[in-house]
């Protein structure tokens, strides 16, 4: 048996084409007015060029989501890349639009996030590390606002900011639990007024959300100005624009907001831009990137983070609501290993055939299919094939999908690239072409905020009730009174269960949704509802991926998979 190559080995063997050749495939002219090269294999598309595309018709939008995942993930990015390559193989002009990886999980639990096997975007090492510096710009803009807040207080606090009611934390793009709650301005009067503060991870930042939901620079600046940063001693809101912060923050983001273009291993175009997490944020790449893809190709394949209860719900109820995007089809990625886990199999036994456990775990897939159909969208299932999957297990999964009225396609893109997704690609194209445009939101914008939360909890998570104390309910009422009642809901919870208890696998019922905290994102224009024990600053696992990452004697990176 031949040695199985690692993702990084495969990526290094890629025969990448110059980025201007990749852009030529989607008719972007080889002119400085259209794009700015960032080396030989990456470019940023200029906003002025994007303005010239406004009158072009849109292509078909395909959303890739997944069943409730294992900690290793079920391969949404890999499947998105593979499906994009498959669509191009069957003669469809397609672009994949992905999120940028965060350094947190790259050095933490999951490792890199540029696909896997023969379904990757490249140059993989650059994409997984600093890429084009977008996350640095977002982090810098966010922390500039933090610095301006404390500076304003130091120089007299003309706005009468109550230091006990500052709601704007600092951020960094790393998993570091020690920074969740800190004291700042210590060391004497020269350093300011001591107060409590903390850090979130950059991908949970409201700046990241605004960056990904803005339509252009003007919209970006307006939204930044509308960020609620604190409250006065009279409990009146203080906004970023009160500190004149929107101008310099937009300056820091003016280049980052241009979409990044790179390529797949099969030299098909990929747009990689923005990267909020889906468990603690809205989990979708930028609106600008998605709209760019729709103007340049007949099909755009994009993914939303974690399971369909998180990323897909937020993509449909937040991103689509804010941008007038409408998917033509949704692909749910399922793996045999995750379904066996939902059927009660222990992690160490997932590689052993167990058809009965698989059948028991299929309730998880069934619920995700039912949930997506509530949005009026056609569904396809992509079975992301692993080497240890058996014929009996695959057969049981595909036959089950037939009984619930969806077609499942066995996908071998990890081993075979686009050739391994041609069946899925053909089915997706068929669903897109006959889409009857029945897309609808789960709730109306005018629905009261608490009712919106209840709707998501009961319709998507299948909870019996939402638990919220008087303080939470009063906060929601105050948001409505302040004019934010039309905002959609962004629920932050564990990605490992429909419930807030990560140990409840399968399709649990009879549980409740306890609200721990709510946050107003007045710039991003949604309400964050934090449930259970989920953290907006993750920690590293006992054995982080960083333990295996190093430079070898040839100066090459090892361990970044």
Curated annotation (Swiss-Prot):
Keywords: ATP-binding, Ligase, Nucleotide-binding, One-carbon metabolism. It is an enzyme of class 6 (ligase). Pathway: One-carbon metabolism; tetrahydrofolate interconversion. It comes from Pelagibacter ubique (strain HTCC1062). ATP binds at residues 70-77. Belongs to the formate--tetrahydrofolate ligase family. NCBIfam families: PRK13505.1 (NF010030). GO terms for molecular function: ATP binding; formate-tetrahydrofolate ligase activity. It catalyses: (6S)-5,6,7,8-tetrahydrofolate + formate + ATP = (6R)-10-formyltetrahydrofolate + ADP + phosphate. Its EC number is 6.3.4.3. This is Formate--tetrahydrofolate ligase. GO terms for biological process: tetrahydrofolate interconversion. It comes from the Bacteria. InterPro entries: Formate_THF_ligase (IPR000559), Formate_THF_ligase_CS (IPR020628), P-loop_NTPase (IPR027417).
């Amino acid at each position: 048996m031949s040695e199985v190559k690692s993702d990084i080995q495969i990526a290094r063997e890629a025969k990448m084409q110059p980025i201007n050749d990749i852009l030529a495939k989607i008719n972007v002219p080889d002119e400085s007015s259209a794009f700015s090269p960032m080396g030989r294999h990456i470019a940023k598309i200029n906003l002025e060029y994007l303005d010239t595309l406004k009158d072009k018709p849109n292509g078909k939008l395909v959303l890739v989501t997944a069943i409730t995942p294992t900690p290793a993930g079920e391969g949404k990015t890999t499947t998105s890349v593979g499906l994009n390559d498959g669509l191009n193989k069957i003669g469809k002009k397609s672009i994949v639009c992905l999120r940028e990886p965060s350094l947190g999980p790259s050095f933490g639990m999951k490792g890199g996030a540029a696909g896997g096997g023969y379904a990757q975007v490249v140059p993989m090492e650059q994409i997984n590390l600093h890429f084009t510096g977008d996350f640095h710009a977002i982090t810098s803009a966010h922390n500039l606002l933090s610095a301006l807040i404390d500076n304003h207080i130091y120089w007299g606090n003309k706005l009468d900011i109550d230091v006990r009611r500052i709601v704007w934390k600092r951020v960094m793009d790393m998993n570091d639990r020690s920074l969740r709650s800190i004291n700042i301005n210590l060391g004497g009067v020269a350093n300011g007024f001591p107060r409590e503060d903390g850090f979130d991870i950059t991908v949970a930042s409201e700046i990241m959300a605004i960056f990904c939901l803005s339509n252009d620079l003007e919209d970006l600046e307006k939204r930044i100005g509308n960020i609620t940063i604190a409250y006065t001693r009279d409990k009146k809101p203080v906004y970023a624009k009160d500190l004149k912060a929107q101008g310099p923050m937009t300056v820091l983001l003016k280049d980052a907001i241009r979409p990044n273009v790179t390529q797949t291993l099969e030299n098909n175009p990929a747009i990689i831009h923005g990267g909020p997490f889906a468990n603690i944020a809205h989990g979708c790449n930028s609106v600008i990137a998605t709209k760019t893809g729709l103007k340049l190709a007949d099909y755009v394949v994009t993914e939303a983070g974690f399971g369909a209860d998180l990323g897909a719900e937020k993509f449909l109820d937040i991103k689509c609501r804010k941008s007038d995007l409408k998917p033509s089809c949704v692909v749910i990625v399922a793996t045999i290993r995750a379904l066996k886990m939902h059927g009660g199999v222990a992690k160490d036994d997932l590689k052993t055939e167990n058809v009965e456990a698989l059948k028991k775990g299929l309730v998880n897939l069934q619920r995700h299919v039912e949930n997506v159909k509530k949005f009026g969208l056609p569904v396809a299932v992509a079975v992301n094939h692993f080497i240890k999957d058996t014929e009996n297990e695959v057969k049981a999964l595909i036959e089950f999908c037939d009984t619930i009225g969806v077609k499942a396609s066995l996908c071998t893109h990890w081993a075979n690239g686009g050739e391994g997704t041609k069946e899925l690609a053909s089915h997706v194209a068929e669903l897109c072409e006959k889409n009857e445009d029945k897309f609808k939101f789960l709730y109306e914008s005018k629905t009261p905020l608490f009712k919106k939360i209840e709707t998501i909890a009961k319709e998507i998570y299948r909870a019996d009730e939402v638990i919220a104390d008087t303080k939470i309910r009063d906060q929601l009422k105050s948001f409505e009174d302040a004019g934010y009642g039309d905002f959609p809901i962004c629920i932050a919870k564990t990605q490992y269960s429909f419930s807030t208890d990560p140990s409840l696998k399968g399709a649990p019922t009879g549980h409740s949704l306890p609200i721990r905290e709510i946050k107003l994102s007045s710039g991003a224009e949604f309400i964050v509802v934090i449930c259970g024990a989920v953290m907006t600053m993750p920690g590293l696992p006992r054995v982080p991926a960083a333990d295996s990452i190093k430079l070898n004697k040839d100066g090459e990176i090892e361990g970044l998979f």
